[in-house]
Design a protein with these regions (language model features):
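Short alpha-helix in the alpha/beta-hydrolase fold that links the catalytic acid
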Residues: 83, 236, 250-260
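Short beta-strand element of the alpha/beta-hydrolase
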Residues: 65-73
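Alpha/beta-hydrolase active-site loop
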Residues: 117-141
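Catalytic active-site module of serine/aspartate enzymes centered on a nucleophile-bearing elbow/loop
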Residues: 276-306
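Short beta-strand/loop motif that positions the catalytic acidic residue
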Residues: 234, 240-242, 246
Length: 306
């Protein structure tokens, strides 16, 4: 249904003021139109990885400045269309897909959410293969002379993304929201110690958390993965966005490990948002996502891998 705006045109000495008012409205409307997200095309796609078919959606601006594949955290996650639309609106080409065994993607989801199968090295490697295949699928749909292609992910992607970048030389950068830079075993020990207590840091110290992280018994037996050893083999730029109140990933230890890698010449950066928790990419604050976008926008158009 169309909405019609009825306007009464004044006469006499108010006519010029009315024209000025209309002119102001037109100027505001033009400004708002200019602020709309970059025109982009949306396409549902499928691609194969490790013998199964994954389903996703691409959002590709007319002139993308760079491109990213969105990589899930843990859980039965479908494609992340809200985040994809936000990034595409800033000129980034995006591919987001349903995790294997979820939504329209084939395969089997490895559960439980926190347990042996989910964090086992074999499953993380399989998820990394999916992210690598998604990178190739996105690259095949991009126009010529596009900017670099990277991986942008959340939480568990702290292990998946470095694994995928090692597999695929097309990956030119990585952005990680609350991605742990520790072993999967250390992360689980920390998460079990905090036990979901949102006020954990009001009653516990970093030293106490480190002690439990080092010595608490493991509840599960699985093949471990160390983010540090993976990152030590890469030379592509990376950005981590951490929340100071995180009770799922040991943030300060992760930052210390990144500082060590940076001292070794790795092109890694991180930002800490003291008031935020683990979900640094949520609508609770726009700052981490905006920081990530600005970092990508500032990246050289062609980034060589060493």
């Amino acid at each position: 249904m169309k909405t019609h705006l009825l306007v009464s045109i004044p006469c006499g000495r108010y006519y010029r003021r009315w024209l000025a008012f209309i002119g102001l409205l037109v100027a505001v409307a033009v400004q708002q139109v200019g602020a709309q997200p970059t025109d982009s095309r949306t396409e549902d796609v499928t691609f194969t990885s490790a013998g199964i078919t994954l389903a996703g959606t691409m959002l590709i601006p007319r002139h993308p400045v760079a491109a990213v594949v969105l990589v899930h955290g843990s859980g039965q996650e479908k494609r992340m269309l809200g985040m994809a639309a936000r990034l595409a609106g800033r000129g980034l080409a995006v591919l987001t897909y349903d995790k294997r065994g979820v939504g329209e993607s084939g395969g089997v989801y490895a559960g439980p959410e926190v347990g042996t199968n989910n964090v086992d090295a074999a499953n993380l490697d399989l998820l990394a293969a999916d992210a690598s295949a998604a990178t190739n699928a996105l690259a095949a749909h991009l126009p010529a002379r596009q900017g670099p292609i990277g991986l942008l992910g959340f939480s568990q992607a702290g292990w998946v993304i470095p694994l995928a970048a090692i597999k695929n030389p097309t990956v030119g950068f990585m952005v990680l929201f609350s991605g742990p830079v520790v072993t999967a075993r250390e992360q689980l020990r920390f998460q079990f110690f905090t036990n979901g207590n949102r006020r954990f840091w009001e009653t516990h110290t970093e030293a106490e958390a480190r002690e439990h992280l080092r010595h608490d018994p493991d509840r599960y037996q699985f093949a471990d993965t160390d983010a540090r050893s993976l990152l030590a083999t890469l030379a592509i730029p990376g950005l981590w966005l951490f929340g100071g109140q995180d009770i799922q990933a040991p943030v300060r230890l992760s930052m210390e490990h990144l500082d060590t890698l940076k001292a070794q010449g790795k092109p890694y950066q991180y930002q800490l948002f003291p008031a935020l928790g683990h979900d640094t990419a949520s609508a609770q604050s726009n700052e981490p996502v905006e920081a990530a976008i600005r970092w990508i926008e500032a990246m050289p158009r062609l980034k060589k891998r060493k």
